[in-house]
């Protein structure tokens, strides 16, 4: 009888330990794919908008996306690659620019600027690196707005140049979303 009780306890203990191990592995794989942006976890199971609204570093971008009426577009299936400027990036613009852009009468200009930060398709850093290699050191990206961005490596940093000659550095790459990928940038990119 003691042998049977011991066997049952051993089986229960093994099953319990196996369950804990599976849960731990599942949590580790989720956390491995989840990046922190603006103090918030960016979950690859959520879309671009649902993640961005949680980043304290992207409140200006989120407000601009709402003002431009782009929420539904960026919640759609995509996939999209978004070069997401931080609040500090927007702060670099001349004083009053953001306040002016979010006014209803400037919606077309705001939409043009925001869609200039979006490329159709999911281009993670490996895909961008491959495009840079194929372009012999520089990749040309076509934006949803219809303009061009150029990407290259400067040391170990990915640099993006806009049509006006402005330069932005990717500060956090490969923030995977259910409908694409976000690369956090430190300067607002401006089309012609």
Language model: regions and residue ranges:
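C-terminal segment of classical bacterial N-terminal signal peptides
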Residues: 14-23
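Mature, structured domains of secreted/extracytosolic soluble proteins
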Residues: 4-6, 22-192
């Amino acid at each position: 009888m003691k042998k049977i009780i011991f066997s049952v306890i051993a089986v229960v203990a093994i099953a319990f330990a196996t369950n804990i191990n599976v849960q731990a592995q599942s949590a580790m794989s989720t956390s491995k794919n989840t990046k922190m942006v603006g103090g918030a976890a960016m979950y690859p199971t959520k879309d671009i908008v649902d993640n961005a609204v949680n980043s304290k570093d992207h409140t200006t971008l989120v407000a601009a996306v709402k003002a431009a009426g782009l929420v539904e577009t960026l919640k759609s299936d995509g996939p999209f690659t978004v070069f997401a400027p931080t609040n500090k990036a927007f702060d670099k613009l001349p004083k009053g620019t953001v306040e002016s852009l979010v006014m209803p009468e400037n919606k077309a200009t705001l939409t043009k600027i925001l869609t200039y930060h979006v490329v159709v398709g999911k281009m993670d850093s490996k895909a961008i690196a491959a495009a840079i290699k194929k372009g012999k050191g520089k990749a040309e990206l076509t934006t949803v707005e219809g303009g061009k961005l150029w990407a290259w490596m400067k040391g170990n940093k990915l640099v993006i140049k806009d049509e006006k000659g402005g330069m932005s550095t990717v500060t956090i790459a490969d923030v995977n979303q259910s409908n694409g990928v976000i690369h956090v940038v430190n300067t607002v990119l401006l089309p012609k």
